[in-house]
């Protein structure tokens, strides 16, 4: 067995833990709080939230480190085990692989709406539910021989992490936009101007590698690069493995898991998005 470490940094957002193929065994908490600004009650709730997620994952917080910080920071270093033969990287995709996404996207749009105080209770609940849902299918997916690449969609958005898969395999990824699951009310909120600055910076960084079909809606660009807090797992697998992959997601309660594209031979663009 080899040791696996996963760093998870969260600001004032729900804590979530990614487990793309390994089994976590313990966590160390890294805490920085403005002690002259936040009450001990608020800090206690943040710590309790982290402990709750670790309890759900079945691991203890075995220690950690605290500092006085200008901004609130809470994170975990997670230690775990994974068999060397079952390490799933983001560079193993093969031509003909199907891409499956475990969670809907749009967290960045919802968080932008929250900051502007235009997010309703239902939208807030969907954001919290999505971001606090642990990616528990990871270890089971890693056991499947037909799964060739595995990563989680986080700060670089769906496009950024699909690009990482395509670059790593020296192939081209295809996304069918109409099949990408979105969190409720995200398109309407986006049209109202609720977008993060990170989305634009992401696109500035990698947009030149992406080709958008003429039928793709205008909001697609901002959502493809929308940063996700605790986004879903992005899997590439052989076509015959797809039913088992989807069944694993469903069994873990990921009912929005969907086929979003495929992997093809290398083209001029590393990522091609069709309507």
Give the ranges of each region predicted by the language model.
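Glycine-rich phosphate/pyrophosphate-binding loop regions near the starts of catalytic domains
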Residues: 1-125
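Glycine-/charge-enriched secondary-structure boundary and capping motifs
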Residues: 1-9, 35-37, 42-60, 67-74, ...
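Non-catalytic interaction surface on structured domains
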Residues: 120, 141-144
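Active-site loop/helix belt of alpha/beta enzymes
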Residues: 129
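A short, well-structured juxtamembrane/interface segment
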Residues: 133-140
């Amino acid at each position: 067995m080899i040791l696996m470490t996963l760093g998870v940094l969260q600001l004032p957002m729900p804590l979530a833990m990614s487990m793309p193929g390994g089994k976590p065994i313990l966590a160390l908490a890294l805490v920085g709080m403005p002690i002259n600004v936040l009450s001990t009650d608020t800090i206690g709730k943040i710590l309790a939230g982290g402990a709750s997620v670790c309890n759900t994952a079945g691991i203890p917080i075995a220690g950690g480190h605290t500092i006085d910080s200008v901004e609130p920071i809470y994170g975990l270093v997670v230690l775990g085990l994974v068999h060397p033969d079952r390490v799933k990287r983001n560079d193993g995709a093969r031509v003909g692989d199907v891409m499956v996404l475990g969670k809907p996207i749009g967290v960045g749009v919802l968080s932008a709406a929250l900051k502007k105080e235009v997010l309703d209770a239902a939208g807030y609940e969907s954001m919290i539910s999505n971001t606090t849902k642990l990616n528990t299918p990871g270890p089971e997916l890693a056991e499947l021989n037909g799964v060739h690449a595995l990563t989680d969609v986080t700060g670089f958005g769906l496009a950024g992490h699909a690009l990482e898969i395509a670059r790593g395999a020296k192939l081209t990824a295809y996304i069918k936009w109409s099949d990408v699951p979105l969190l409720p009310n995200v398109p309407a909120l986006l049209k109202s101007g609720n977008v993060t600055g990170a989305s634009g910076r992401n696109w500035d960084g990698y947009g030149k590698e992406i080709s958008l079909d003429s039928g793709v809606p205008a909001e697609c660009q901002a959502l493809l690069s929308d940063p996700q807090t605790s986004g879903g797992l992005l899997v590439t697998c052989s076509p015959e493995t797809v039913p088992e992959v989807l069944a694993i997601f469903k069994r873990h309660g990921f009912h929005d898991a969907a086929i979003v594209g495929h992997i093809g031979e290398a083209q001029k663009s590393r990522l091609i998005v069709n309507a």
